[in-house]
Structure formats: C-alpha cells, structure tokens
C-alpha cells in the first residue's frame, strides 16, 4: 500500500487530531440531536483497533508495509511491544525534525530530509526513516540562519509546540541534540498502542 496523498481533512474528521499529518483544523458542523435518538450502530472491537492503527499510519506517514516491519522489530525487542513501537517511530529522523519545530508537519519534515538539508553528526542523511540515537547532533544546512530561526520560533508559538524533554534545540547554532530515547509519557499523540498490536495478532 502506497503512502497517502489524498485530502487530509477527510482523515482528521474521522480519526480526530493528528498533529503530524496537518497543522490545520477542520470546522465541524453542529448536528441537531433528537431527544430520543440513539446511534444505530456500535463500533466493533476490530473497528476500534483499525482506527488506532490508522492513527499511527497517517500521523507518522507510513505505508502498511513499513508499519508491519516496525511491529516485527518491536516484537523481537525487550519490553512492552506497544511502547517499543512508539519509541521506534518517535526516533525517526523526520519526526525529530518535526518535534524540533523546524517543519510544521511530518510530511514537510520528510521533504526537508529528502532534499539533503539535514546533517546527522556532520554527515548528510537523506533517509526520513533513519533511526536517531542518543547523543546524535542534527544540523540544518541553510544559507540564511536567521530565517530558519524565525521559522522555528513561528512554528513553536503559532502551534504552541514545546520541544520534548528528550531533545535539545540550540537556535544559536541551528542544531538539535537527541538527549535520550523518548519516554512513553512524553509522546504527544493520543493513541492506544496495544490495540494496534492486537490488530496484527
């Protein structure tokens, strides 16, 4: 299955807030609720698991095949499979660029990486799925450092986005540092990761 390139509001209305997919917010129409009305259908367990799986896919911009690969890696690792899965996804290079505030969304961060604007420990890395490790130093290649600082400050203030505790942003030198692997409590995406694992069992 290829990466989703269709309308993003359609996904947001169905799965609710996914900050990695889009920074915009759709307008919801107010529905008039009748006094004795009841929902005519109930969500099955399979549907709930499917929606949680789709949240991860669309938030991080993964294909079905990529997500399966991450789940297989998480199953072989020590610890909670769901927590390891989220940590693997959060430590992707495109997600780190997004979390630092350099890009508005993860697709925008992926484009920055693909265009070879990112250096990891002094080397150009153009693979968005590159797994960052503790003590990695990320630098952005730019001809106008002042403009980059303005973009970062604008993204952080407009979307009220704080740099997570596992990262450090040095605006003076236009670089970010990965301090450690992210903790589960610091992950911003509202997700029930064990339902995703259950979906693939």
Curated annotation (Swiss-Prot):
Q: Which GO terms describe its cellular component?
A: chloroplast; small ribosomal subunit
Keyword Nucleotide-binding assigned: no
Which compartment or compartments is the protein found in?
A: Plastid, Chloroplast
Where would I find the S4 RNA-binding domain in this sequence? 91-151
Query: What keywords is this UniProt entry annotated with?
Result: Chloroplast, Plastid, Ribonucleoprotein, Ribosomal protein, RNA-binding, rRNA-binding
Task: Supply one GO molecular-function term.
Answer: structural constituent of ribosome
- Chloroplast found in the keyword field: yes
PANTHER family xrefs? 30S 40S RIBOSOMAL PROTEIN, SMALL RIBOSOMAL SUBUNIT PROTEIN US4M
Similarity comment text for this entry:
Belongs to the universal ribosomal protein uS4 family.
Assembly and partners are described as:
Part of the 30S ribosomal subunit. Contacts protein S5. The interaction surface between S4 and S5 is involved in control of translational fidelity.
Chain's role: One of the primary rRNA binding proteins, it binds directly to 16S rRNA where it nucleates assembly of the body of the 30S subunit.
Q: What is this protein called?
A: Small ribosomal subunit protein uS4c
Q: Tell me which species this is from.
A: Welwitschia mirabilis
């Amino acid at each position: 299955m290829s990466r989703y390139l269709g309308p993003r509001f359609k996904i947001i209305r169905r799965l609710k807030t996914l900050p990695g997919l889009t920074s915009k917010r759709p307008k919801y129409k107010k529905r008039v609720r009748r006094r004795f009305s009841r929902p005519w259908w109930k969500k099955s367990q399979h549907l709930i698991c499917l929606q949680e799986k789709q949240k991860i896919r669309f938030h991080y911009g993964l294909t079905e095949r990529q997500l399966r690969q991450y789940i297989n890696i998480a199953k072989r690792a020590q610890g909670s499979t769901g927590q390891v899965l989220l940590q693997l996804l959060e430590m992707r290079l495109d997600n780190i660029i997004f979390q630092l505030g350099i890009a508005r969304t993860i697709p925008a961060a992926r484009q920055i990486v693909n265009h070879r604007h990112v250096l990891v420990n002094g080397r150009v890395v153009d693979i968005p799925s590159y797994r960052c490790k503790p003590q990695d130093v990320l630098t952005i290649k730019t001809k106008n450092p002042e403009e980059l600082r303005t973009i970062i400050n604008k993204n952080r203030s407009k979307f009220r986005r704080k740099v997570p505790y596992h990262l450090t942003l040095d605006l003076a030198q236009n670089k970010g540092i990965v301090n450690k692997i992210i903790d589960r409590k610091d992950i911003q995406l509202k997700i029930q990761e064990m339902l995703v694992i259950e979906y693939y069992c």
